[in-house]
């Protein structure tokens, strides 16, 4: 089998034996790839540091039966340099990598849009020109769009009645009209769904003056919507809530509920 090259983001790694590591890569053309990096834990390894999480690399691989083998690595962007020493940036970037891996699908299924989105999100976190929670929420919303899970933010998610609508229900698919509104639907403050829509569209100018309270509500709805579809919580989201306690207010505390609260309109508490 022939060697192949691809552009990749290192999602995670773990030890294999005394000197090797298994790395999980999100590649542009081959989707998720798991590969062995031989000897990278040795002091004299020629590319060990280039295979750390958050790295954006150009990699050459040899196809294997179960795991490919890394043969060459060149750094494209060393995002970790500007991420790992800042807790907020680090936890945000970890959530981006975890989400990318969960949404990439089966191994070797091409995911060029998700790859490009992940690289862009890591670059934005490293440059730190915008609040980390907005970068993360924009990434999550767009990534869910690629997976077919984008929440309805204007027209009713159930009957398509023209919006805007005030109620939001995760299990229903997003914004719902007064006729389709199920028990337990949340009523976000005015401007929250507009913020989420601006993040999906990349309209950053519209996000600049949004109060932290509205950003916190939007973050809660985005996280709840993602976790509903994933069917289990991302490990990194509670860490992000601790990193920004004022902005990442839990949904049940920041969004007024009509009727009994239910698990479809809240995020899980940090452990």
Swiss-Prot record:
Q: Where is this region: Disordered?
A: 249-271
InterPro entries in the record: ARFGAP/RecO, DNA_rep/recomb_RecO_N, NA-bd_OB-fold, RecO, RecO_C
**Per the record's keyword annotation, is DNA repair included, yes or no?**
yes
Q: Name one Pfam family in it.
A: RecO_C
Cellular component terms per the entry's GO annotation: bacterial nucleoid
Q: Where is the composition biased (Basic and acidic residues)?
A: 249-264
Keyword set, alphabetical order = DNA damage, DNA recombination, DNA repair
A single Gene Ontology biological process assigned to it is: double-strand break repair
DNA damage as a keyword of this entry, yes or no, is yes
Q: Which NCBIfam families match?
A: reco (TIGR00613)
**So what does this one do?**
Involved in DNA repair and RecF pathway recombination.
| Family from the record | Belongs to the RecO family.
What's the name of the protein? DNA repair protein RecO
Tell me the organism: Rhodococcus jostii (strain RHA1)
């Amino acid at each position: 089998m022939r060697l192949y090259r691809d552009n990749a983001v290192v999602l995670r790694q773990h030890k294999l034996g005394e000197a090797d590591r298994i790395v999980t890569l999100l590649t542009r053309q081959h989707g998720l790839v798991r590969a062995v990096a031989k000897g990278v834990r040795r002091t004299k390894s020629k590319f060990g540091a280039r295979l750390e999480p958050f790295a954006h690399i150009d990699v050459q691989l040899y196809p294997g039966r179960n795991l490919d083998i890394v043969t060459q690595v060149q750094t494209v962007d060393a995002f970790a340099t500007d991420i790992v020493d800042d807790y907020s940036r680090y936890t945000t970037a970890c959530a981006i990598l975890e989400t990318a891996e969960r949404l990439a699908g089966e191994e070797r299924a091409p995911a060029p849009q998700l790859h490009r989105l992940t690289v862009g999100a890591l670059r934005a976190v490293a440059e730190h020109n915008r609040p980390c929670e907005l970068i993360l929420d924009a990434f999550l919303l767009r990534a869910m769009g690629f997976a077919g899970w984008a929440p309805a933010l204007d027209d009713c998610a159930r009957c398509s009645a023209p919006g805007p609508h005030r109620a939001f229900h995760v299990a229903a698919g997003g914004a719902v009209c007064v006729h389709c509104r199920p028990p337990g639907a949340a009523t976000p403050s005015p401007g929250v769904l507009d913020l989420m829509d601006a993040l999906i569209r990349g309209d950053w100018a519209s996000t600049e003056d949004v109060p932290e309270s509205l950003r916190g509500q939007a973050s809660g709805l985005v996280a709840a919507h993602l976790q509903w579809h994933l069917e289990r919580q991302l490990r990194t989201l509670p860490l992000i809530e601790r990193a920004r306690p004022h902005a990442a207010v839990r949904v049940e505390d920041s969004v007024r509920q009509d009727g009994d609260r239910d698990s479809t309109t809240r995020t899980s508490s940090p452990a």
